[in-house]
Amino acid sequence: TNKGASASRNRGVQLAKGDYIAFLDADDYWDPEKLEKQEKALAKTGDVLCCTGRELIYDQEPEKKKIFSVPERITYKMLLRGNVIGCSSVLAKRSVLLEFPMEKDECHEDYLDWLRILKKYGTACGVDEPLLKYRLSSTGKSGNKLHSAGMTYRVYRELGMGTFRSLYCFACYAVNG
């Protein structure tokens, strides 16, 4: 049975043997140097999580592309205002992903996880190069903007924020997103 993305990712993290974990969704692909560049960034900063910039490719219009940059340092507060961390762009310490398993498939479970990790560990590092090619489909979880907005609001509520703080964070997210 399909238990959702969270269960699949968590199972992979549990079965993995290495020190680092990288996720790659089925319709995305990486630059061949992605992992090497991220390992160097993690070694340099001592962070537990690293992400990269990404190039968005629209399924309906493949010639239309958009580049998303990432800052070199990403804090919890910055991440509350907008999710710059694409799941398939992440390289993270396995021990941290075991500590913070993904849950809540009904919201953006990866965004929720990154926020929980940064709340404890402080910062993530970013490699500002589009080392991830990310495909956006209108049928995907993030493709429907209204549905995605509701999932983002639920992330803030899952973090224990009250209604007004959640609405404030969501407004910041919407402006930055």
Where are these regions (language model features)?
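Glycine-rich, basic loop-to-helix element that forms the pyrophosphate-binding segment
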Residues: 1-16, 37
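Conserved nucleotide-sugar donor-binding catalytic segment
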Residues: 14, 69-147
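Short aromatic/hydrophobic "clamp" motif used to bind/position activated sugar donors
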Residues: 21
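The conserved acidic donor/metal-binding loop of glycosyltransferases
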Residues: 25-29
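Conserved donor NDP-sugar-binding/catalytic core segment of glycosyltransferases
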Residues: 33-65
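Non-catalytic, C-terminal membrane-associated alpha-helical segments of glycosyltransferases
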Residues: 124, 138-177
